[in-house]
Amino acid sequence: RRQLLEPAVQPNAAHVALARLEQKFTGDCLLVTQNVDDLHERGGSSDVLHLHGEIFKARSSKNEALLYELGDQDIYAGDLCEQGDQLRPHIVWFGEDVPMYPIAHDITQTADLVIVVGTSLKVQPASFLASAAPYHVARIVVDPKAEADVPAFYLRHPAGEIMPSLVDYLLQQGMEDLSGLDQLAPQQKN
């Protein structure tokens, strides 16, 4: 968590590109992330659903609805919520249920387009979201190591390199015409 507060840790080009897409389709675009950091928000996104929680927040150990902004503060034994229960990081620990998954699943079932970025589709249950959209809905998977486990158009490039081009394409061509995706090339690094 402390490392995320370092000035060198900044959103990459993929975070910024996704924010551009959200800004164009305000109210119709939801970013679902497995990441517990705030890089999407710092990149400009505002409609973000954190499947595994948020590392800069704390919550009651008994009442998940009691959330508190942590910022750069640490949590110690004896730090209590207003109801007297121990505070804990607002993240999903190994073996715990993912409480935001049903919400993400329901939203995915009404999607017009699903873009999966930065995952090889091996982490469950989040990888199931790529399959949750109706069969006719186009899916784009962006990850150099993604395996063809779901019917999708695969862009096997690092997200920070290809997402700006993908978002430019979607903003220019629209969400319906994906025929030119195979022509996309990663942005050149300077």
Name the predicted role of every residue range.
Residues 1-190:
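Conserved catalytic alpha/beta core of Sir2/sirtuin-type deacylases, generalized to analogous enzyme cores
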